[in-house]
Amino acid sequence: SKLFNQRYKNVFSGDSKWKAVKAPKGLTYNWDKNSTYVQHPPFFQNMNDDKKEVNNIEKARVLAIFGDSVTTDHISPAGSIKSDGPAGAYLRNNKVKNNEFNSFGARRGNHEVMMRGTFSNIRIKNEMLSNIEGGYTIHYPSNKQLSIYDAAMKYKKYNTPLVIFAGIDYGM
């Protein structure tokens, strides 16, 4: 539109400092495999226009049972990253110091961080556990209390389908 063209017509103009900024060249983004902020998400790789068959969910395990009013911030938090959680462990394993973790909001461009943060809000209550808040569940058949991420990865290893139950206003 006219406003866009007006505002961005000089986007590549600037002073000598602006012109000295080094930036990769190319038509597409050059993904940095070492970045802990932005990673190339695998979700669309090998995707095509073929329709996938929808299968029945059978022999699934329950990953979590939530009550009412589970918000988007319970599901995908934007707050601080706990050093003792799966996302914190991932960042430490990638040589990020605890005081440099930043927040889930700042690291939304890294699917590895975000999937470890899913359901990790410190106030979420999984009714499968008594008197415990945070992103935890019970893994079956081991009966061990694990982070929701760690349990999900164990189930994935054995191709175990998962379900989550939640009350009204889920995702509001």
Q: What spans do the regions from the language model cover?
A:
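Fe-S-dependent hydro-lyases/dehydratases of central metabolism
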Residues: 1-172
